Amino acid sequence: MARGKVQLRRIENPVHRQVTFCKRRAGLLKKARELSILCEADIGIIIFSAHGKLYDLATTGTMEELIERYKSASGEQANACGDQRMDPKQEAMVLKQEINLLQKGLRYIYGNRANEHMTVEELNALERYLEIWMYNIRSAKMQIMIQEIQALKSKEGMLKAANEILQEKIVEQNGLIDVGMMVADQQNGHFSTVPLLEEITNPLTILSGYSTCRGSEMGYSF
Protein backbone atom coordinates (compact mmCIF):
# COMPACT_ATOMS: atom_id res chain seq x y z
CA MET A 1 0.00 0.00 0.00
CA ALA A 2 1.46 3.37 -1.00
CA ARG A 3 2.24 5.80 1.76
CA GLY A 4 0.74 9.25 1.63
CA LYS A 5 2.78 12.42 1.59
CA VAL A 6 3.76 13.71 5.01
CA GLN A 7 3.08 17.39 5.49
CA LEU A 8 6.14 19.23 6.79
CA ARG A 9 5.48 21.63 9.62
CA ARG A 10 7.20 23.01 12.69
CA ILE A 11 7.73 20.55 15.54
CA GLU A 12 5.96 21.99 18.54
CA ASN A 13 7.77 20.00 21.22
CA PRO A 14 11.13 21.75 21.84
CA VAL A 15 12.88 18.53 22.91
CA HIS A 16 11.74 16.66 19.82
CA ARG A 17 12.65 19.67 17.70
CA GLN A 18 16.21 19.77 19.05
CA VAL A 19 16.68 16.02 18.59
CA THR A 20 15.42 16.22 14.98
CA PHE A 21 17.71 19.17 14.28
CA CYS A 22 20.77 17.30 15.51
CA LYS A 23 19.93 14.18 13.50
CA ARG A 24 19.11 16.03 10.27
CA ARG A 25 22.17 18.29 10.60
CA ALA A 26 24.48 15.32 11.02
CA GLY A 27 22.89 13.60 8.01
CA LEU A 28 23.22 16.72 5.85
CA LEU A 29 26.90 17.19 6.70
CA LYS A 30 27.57 13.50 6.08
CA LYS A 31 25.92 13.65 2.63
CA ALA A 32 27.95 16.76 1.78
CA ARG A 33 31.22 15.03 2.67
CA GLU A 34 30.26 11.98 0.61
CA LEU A 35 29.36 14.16 -2.38
CA SER A 36 32.67 15.99 -2.11
CA ILE A 37 34.65 12.74 -2.05
CA LEU A 38 32.71 11.00 -4.82
CA CYS A 39 32.51 13.92 -7.24
CA GLU A 40 35.52 16.06 -6.21
CA ALA A 41 33.19 18.97 -5.47
CA ASP A 42 34.03 21.90 -3.23
CA ILE A 43 31.09 22.29 -0.84
CA GLY A 44 30.45 24.88 1.82
CA ILE A 45 27.51 24.69 4.26
CA ILE A 46 26.52 27.28 6.86
CA ILE A 47 23.82 26.46 9.43
CA PHE A 48 22.39 28.61 12.21
CA SER A 49 20.29 26.88 14.83
CA ALA A 50 17.14 28.35 16.35
CA HIS A 51 19.27 29.64 19.24
CA GLY A 52 21.77 31.31 16.90
CA LYS A 53 24.52 28.72 17.18
CA LEU A 54 26.72 28.43 14.07
CA TYR A 55 27.57 25.16 12.33
CA ASP A 56 29.62 25.18 9.14
CA LEU A 57 31.42 22.79 6.82
CA ALA A 58 34.09 23.45 4.21
CA THR A 59 35.14 20.33 2.34
CA THR A 60 38.14 22.07 0.76
CA GLY A 61 40.20 24.70 2.58
CA THR A 62 38.39 27.05 4.93
CA MET A 63 34.95 28.62 4.85
CA GLU A 64 36.50 32.07 4.30
CA GLU A 65 38.24 30.82 1.16
CA LEU A 66 35.00 29.35 -0.17
CA ILE A 67 33.18 32.60 0.53
CA GLU A 68 35.84 34.57 -1.34
CA ARG A 69 35.53 32.19 -4.28
CA TYR A 70 31.77 32.63 -4.20
CA LYS A 71 32.09 36.42 -4.21
CA SER A 72 34.56 36.31 -7.07
CA ALA A 73 32.37 34.00 -9.16
CA SER A 74 29.27 36.08 -8.45
CA GLY A 75 31.13 39.26 -9.42
CA GLU A 76 32.29 37.73 -12.70
CA GLN A 77 28.74 36.72 -13.58
CA ALA A 78 27.48 40.19 -12.77
CA ASN A 79 30.20 41.75 -14.91
CA ALA A 80 29.38 39.38 -17.76
CA CYS A 81 25.74 40.43 -17.60
CA GLY A 82 26.79 44.06 -17.50
CA ASP A 83 29.09 43.63 -20.49
CA GLN A 84 26.20 42.27 -22.53
CA ARG A 85 24.49 45.65 -22.27
CA MET A 86 26.14 47.76 -24.94
CA ASP A 87 25.78 51.47 -25.31
CA PRO A 88 23.89 52.78 -28.36
CA LYS A 89 27.10 53.57 -30.29
CA GLN A 90 28.47 50.05 -29.92
CA GLU A 91 25.11 48.55 -30.79
CA ALA A 92 24.88 50.71 -33.93
CA MET A 93 28.39 49.67 -34.93
CA VAL A 94 27.55 45.98 -34.51
CA LEU A 95 24.38 46.38 -36.58
CA LYS A 96 26.33 48.17 -39.30
CA GLN A 97 28.84 45.33 -39.44
CA GLU A 98 26.03 42.80 -39.71
CA ILE A 99 24.39 44.77 -42.54
CA ASN A 100 27.68 44.99 -44.43
CA LEU A 101 28.23 41.26 -43.98
CA LEU A 102 24.74 40.43 -45.23
CA GLN A 103 25.03 42.71 -48.25
CA LYS A 104 28.39 41.19 -49.08
CA GLY A 105 26.93 37.72 -48.66
CA LEU A 106 24.02 38.51 -50.99
CA ARG A 107 26.39 39.71 -53.68
CA TYR A 108 28.47 36.59 -53.18
CA ILE A 109 25.42 34.31 -53.40
CA TYR A 110 24.10 35.95 -56.57
CA GLY A 111 27.30 35.18 -58.48
CA ASN A 112 29.52 38.20 -57.91
CA ARG A 113 32.24 36.05 -56.40
CA ALA A 114 35.03 37.53 -58.48
CA ASN A 115 34.69 40.97 -56.87
CA GLU A 116 33.55 39.78 -53.43
CA HIS A 117 36.05 37.76 -51.45
CA MET A 118 34.75 36.29 -48.19
CA THR A 119 36.79 34.67 -45.47
CA VAL A 120 35.87 31.45 -43.69
CA GLU A 121 34.69 33.41 -40.66
CA GLU A 122 32.43 35.55 -42.81
CA LEU A 123 31.01 32.50 -44.57
CA ASN A 124 30.36 30.80 -41.23
CA ALA A 125 28.59 33.90 -39.96
CA LEU A 126 26.55 34.09 -43.16
CA GLU A 127 25.63 30.42 -42.80
CA ARG A 128 24.36 31.04 -39.28
CA TYR A 129 22.25 33.95 -40.50
CA LEU A 130 20.82 31.81 -43.30
CA GLU A 131 19.95 29.02 -40.86
CA ILE A 132 18.14 31.53 -38.65
CA TRP A 133 16.27 32.92 -41.64
CA MET A 134 15.28 29.45 -42.83
CA TYR A 135 14.03 28.58 -39.37
CA ASN A 136 11.98 31.76 -39.19
CA ILE A 137 10.63 31.21 -42.71
CA ARG A 138 9.62 27.62 -41.92
CA SER A 139 8.00 28.71 -38.67
CA ALA A 140 6.02 31.46 -40.41
CA LYS A 141 5.02 29.06 -43.19
CA MET A 142 3.88 26.44 -40.70
CA GLN A 143 1.88 29.03 -38.77
CA ILE A 144 0.14 30.18 -41.96
CA MET A 145 -0.65 26.58 -42.93
CA ILE A 146 -2.11 25.88 -39.49
CA GLN A 147 -4.29 28.98 -39.72
CA GLU A 148 -5.48 27.98 -43.20
CA ILE A 149 -6.31 24.45 -42.03
CA GLN A 150 -8.26 25.84 -39.09
CA ALA A 151 -10.15 28.19 -41.43
CA LEU A 152 -10.98 25.29 -43.78
CA LYS A 153 -12.20 23.18 -40.87
CA SER A 154 -14.39 26.06 -39.71
CA LYS A 155 -15.83 26.46 -43.22
CA GLU A 156 -16.40 22.71 -43.43
CA GLY A 157 -18.37 22.79 -40.18
CA MET A 158 -20.45 25.71 -41.41
CA LEU A 159 -21.18 23.94 -44.71
CA LYS A 160 -22.22 20.76 -42.90
CA ALA A 161 -24.58 22.72 -40.67
CA ALA A 162 -26.06 24.54 -43.69
CA ASN A 163 -26.46 21.21 -45.52
CA GLU A 164 -28.34 19.71 -42.58
CA ILE A 165 -30.66 22.72 -42.45
CA LEU A 166 -31.34 22.45 -46.20
CA GLN A 167 -32.08 18.74 -45.90
CA GLU A 168 -34.56 19.39 -43.09
CA LYS A 169 -36.29 22.05 -45.17
CA ILE A 170 -36.47 19.70 -48.18
CA VAL A 171 -38.05 16.98 -46.04
CA GLU A 172 -40.59 19.45 -44.67
CA GLN A 173 -41.44 20.73 -48.16
CA ASN A 174 -41.84 17.18 -49.52
CA GLY A 175 -44.22 16.36 -46.69
CA LEU A 176 -46.31 19.45 -47.41
CA ILE A 177 -46.42 18.57 -51.14
CA ASP A 178 -47.64 15.02 -50.40
CA VAL A 179 -50.39 16.28 -48.10
CA GLY A 180 -51.47 18.87 -50.68
CA MET A 181 -51.71 16.23 -53.43
CA MET A 182 -53.89 13.99 -51.24
CA VAL A 183 -56.27 16.86 -50.46
CA ALA A 184 -56.51 17.75 -54.15
CA ASP A 185 -57.32 14.15 -55.11
CA GLN A 186 -60.10 13.97 -52.52
CA GLN A 187 -61.63 17.23 -53.76
CA ASN A 188 -61.61 15.94 -57.36
CA GLY A 189 -63.29 12.66 -56.36
CA HIS A 190 -60.28 10.47 -57.06
CA PHE A 191 -59.52 7.90 -54.40
CA SER A 192 -56.79 5.36 -54.48
CA THR A 193 -58.29 2.09 -53.31
CA VAL A 194 -57.17 -1.51 -53.49
CA PRO A 195 -59.03 -3.39 -56.28
CA LEU A 196 -61.56 -5.90 -54.90
CA LEU A 197 -62.26 -9.35 -56.36
CA GLU A 198 -65.71 -9.36 -57.97
CA GLU A 199 -66.33 -13.03 -57.39
CA ILE A 200 -64.94 -15.04 -54.57
CA THR A 201 -65.63 -18.78 -54.60
CA ASN A 202 -66.85 -20.13 -51.25
CA PRO A 203 -64.99 -23.32 -50.38
CA LEU A 204 -67.89 -24.56 -48.25
CA THR A 205 -70.22 -24.59 -51.30
CA ILE A 206 -67.77 -26.71 -53.28
CA LEU A 207 -67.42 -29.18 -50.43
CA SER A 208 -71.23 -29.48 -50.02
CA GLY A 209 -71.79 -30.25 -53.72
CA TYR A 210 -69.11 -32.88 -53.73
CA SER A 211 -70.71 -34.66 -50.75
CA THR A 212 -74.20 -34.73 -52.38
CA CYS A 213 -72.83 -36.25 -55.58
CA ARG A 214 -71.01 -39.05 -53.78
CA GLY A 215 -74.07 -39.84 -51.64
CA SER A 216 -76.34 -40.28 -54.68
CA GLU A 217 -73.92 -42.70 -56.27
CA MET A 218 -73.87 -44.87 -53.12
CA GLY A 219 -77.65 -44.85 -52.56
CA TYR A 220 -77.79 -42.30 -49.83
CA SER A 221 -79.86 -39.20 -49.84
CA PHE A 222 -79.17 -35.99 -47.97
Curated annotation (Swiss-Prot):
Look up the record and report any one GO term of the cellular component aspect: nucleus
So which domain of life are we looking at?
A: Eukaryota
- Membrane-crossing ranges are none
What this protein is reported to do is described as:
Probable transcription factor.
Q: What is this protein called?
A: MADS-box transcription factor 26
Query: What GO biological process term is on the record, naming one?
Result: positive regulation of transcription by RNA polymerase II
Report the GO molecular function annotations. DNA-binding transcription factor activity, RNA polymerase II-specific; protein dimerization activity; RNA polymerase II cis-regulatory region sequence-specific DNA binding
Q: Which Pfam families match?
A: K-box, SRF-TF
Main localization of the protein described in the UniProt heading: nucleus
Question: What keywords appear on the UniProt entry?
Answer: DNA-binding, Nucleus, Transcription, Transcription regulation
Summed up, the tissue specificity of this protein is: Expressed in leaves and spikelets (rice flower).
Q: Does the keyword Amino-acid biosynthesis apply?
A: no
Residues in domain K-box?
A: 85-176
**Signal peptide segment:** none
Compartmental location = Nucleus
Where would I find the MADS-box domain in this sequence? Answer: 1-61
Is the Nucleus keyword given for this protein?
yes
Q: Which CDD domains match?
A: MADS_MEF2_like
